[in-house]
């Protein structure tokens, strides 16, 4: 497409730092959005505005402009290279739909196209983008028209054990975006969800435990005073293998029973967690072996039959700062797992 002189001028002006441009000129050129200057980086194809402080891809910005029925920006973003078909994800009036058709949009998106655009937009893992995705998609009727099984599959990949058996799509999607914010520690987005969804405070605590996010766990438990039964917390920490950070925090910082953490790990068949608990001082080995046999987990019972496990004395049991805990356990390899592995290589487990 050949750009007009006016469009080129806007493109150049949008690439300048806002301090170099008088607000009057930005407003005249339509580069004032959300009560502040709008910036465009043509190399990254990203837009910044007061609500998009981390920047969003121009296609995502187009989705927002269409949702707001901002005709000037729909035209401008399309001229700057946005795919006009993305506007169909959020168009909500006939007048806006007619404009998008004039600019080349399809009559409607196919199911696979909706899912493709959905997956493409969410890839930009910034607070600005995840908040935008939540606002655009969590109550969007266009998602009601696509294959529910496929969409639930996408959500399950993120939530796993925290996926609820509900048909209320908006609830699932809210937790989906919230979960992404927690997993990738998107602090502005986390604060956004925390302020708006008070009923999800305990769910966020469960998510932090399950996804080994010790910083968020500390934030919720020590600072926000969010509470739940300690044994339930242990279960969520032990449910996913190699959750060393949240197991350490629960047992060493909060004082949860390390043997109980080992038992939960055995029940979930998470061998990495089990050995880490032994590293931390779990010593109810015979009880653990009995539990493994009761739960028909013979391989774990065989592992626990080796009589040479002990606490890892080199592992500090005094840390309470989540950042220090993260650094300490970043590349941690279990001492007792190494012992079991060497035994297996040398003897096998057939004779145990």
From Swiss-Prot:
The keyword NAD does not apply. Coiled coil: none annotated. Belongs to the asfivirus MGF 360 family. GO terms for cellular component: host cell cytoplasm. It holds the Pfam family ASFV_360. GO terms for biological process: taxis. InterPro entries: ASFV_MGF360 (IPR002595). Keywords: Early protein, Host cytoplasm. Plays a role in virus cell tropism, and may be required for efficient virus replication in macrophages. In addition, inhibits IFN-beta-induced IFN-stimulated genes (ISGs) transcription. Mechanistically, degrades host STAT1 and STAT2 through apoptosis and ubiquitin-proteasome pathways respectively. It is found in: Host cytoplasm. This is Protein MGF 360-9L. Interacts with host STAT1; this interaction mediates STAT1 degradation through apoptosis. Interacts with host STAT2; this interaction mediates STAT2 degradation through the proteasome.
